[in-house]
Amino acid sequence: MRRRNFLLLSGSGLAAAGLAACGGSGGGGGESGGSEVEVFTWWAQGSEKAGLDALVEQFEKDYPDLTFVNGSVAGGAGSAAKDMLQSRLQAGDPPDTFQAHAGLELADYIDAGQLEDVSDLYDEYGLTEAFPSDLVELLTLDDKIYSVPSNIHRSNVVWTNVELLEAAGIDPSAVPSDVDAFIADVQKAADSGVTGLSIGTTWTQVNLLEAILMADLGSEAYNGLWTGETDWNGAEVTTAVGHFEQLIALTNTDRDGLDWTDATQMQIDGTAAYSVMGDWAVASFQQAEWEDGKDFGYFPLTGGEAIFGFLADSFTLPVGAPNPDGAKAWLDTISSQDGQLAFSLAKGSIPARTDVDTEEFPAYQQTAITSYAEDAISPSLAHGAATPVAWLNEISDATSKFTTGASDAAGYQEELATIAEKHASA
């Protein structure tokens, strides 16, 4: 029920909501008590840490009597943090608040009774009016809401090193019309003597897989993969798996030892032409003082349909949190106009609120704002919007087997289909 509700919304409702460019000021009342507030995230490095630092700065302005305690754990798009978090929750030792991806990633925590209902905060902080109505509906389960989004990201973005593309005879302003055309360009870049497509460990490979599936299947059929309405054994999935195999062959051989920051750094260092990564990568290019359009470029991986690969960072209130009032103060800051503006400017995302002044956002975020308002919306697999954690973990294991040579394309597709049959009917 949850899965179908999310995917029905993601096809059109969220896209219609958009973002307005109007002014406003942030929240922040004045919780006092001098208590520590442990905030558990996986934002431990690069632009992610820069985004967290921006939130902490705003939090300290909003609540000077509270002390932020950084519980960040690095690695694997949150996989290391989620493993540690699960151990703590099972041991009855929750942090005051923890980061999660909005969507079905939260289902396991909700089913285990590990999250408090924060619906009252939506009324207290005015969030029901500030967030798009369809986003609020997406976050609602049985008339309860269990997380507060801090921003919205796009997962299906191709990033380019303009100089390397030009050296390979590729027009950096031309957007490939489909995945076959993109593969041809990556091959051309590889033939010029650089890594065609830089990538990291398993979760970044799953991010590439989802981008290919979106492009090859289109939004409706891609969304159907998670509801049982699209056959994982179908010809379109076979095509997508073949494209994935071709692109993996054009990536760096040390990929399994790298994270996304390392893969992006390969482009900045001039050793890789392309990457496929969420739009948090833009902050890395900006921090390197690269100029948009001159040094780096970007476009969504497409098969013809304009699709926004959706994910949202959010924060929760765990059952048994040592300082629930401190956690609520953090939720106030991250959902405020000032908090969402500061965070998204630093992290490369766009605000979840519709009343944040977006005029000062750089060019990439402006394109994301437009796309989010106009394009089809599909939930990210790699980042918890499309499936519960258990399903994603099994896809990740199957993907690792495939990219390390332990299975072939046919076996990989068959395993993906078996995993889907197990979970889609659950």
Q: What do the PLM-derived regions correspond to, one by one?
A:
Residues P64, F296-F299, S344-S396, S425-A426:
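Long, aromatic- and glycine/proline-rich binding clefts that accommodate carbohydrate-like moieties
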Residues S119-F131, A174-S177, L197, D216-T239, ...:
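Short, solvent-exposed loop/beta-turn-alpha elements that line the ligand-binding surface or hinge
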Residues H101-S155, A363:
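Hinge/lid segment of periplasmic solute-binding proteins
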Residues S72-M84, G103, S177-I183, R255-I268:
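Short helix-initiation/N-cap motifs at beta->coil->alpha
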Residues K61, A249-L250, Q287-S349, S407:
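Extracytoplasmic/periplasmic substrate-recognition and gating elements
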Residues A184-K188, T227-D256:
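Glycine-centered hinge/linker elements that transmit conformational signals in sensory
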Residues L141-S150, N156, D180-E229, A272:
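Extracytoplasmic/periplasmic solute-binding protein
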Residues R2-A107, A112, P172, F361, ...:
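Conserved N-terminal structural module of periplasmic/extracytoplasmic solute-binding proteins
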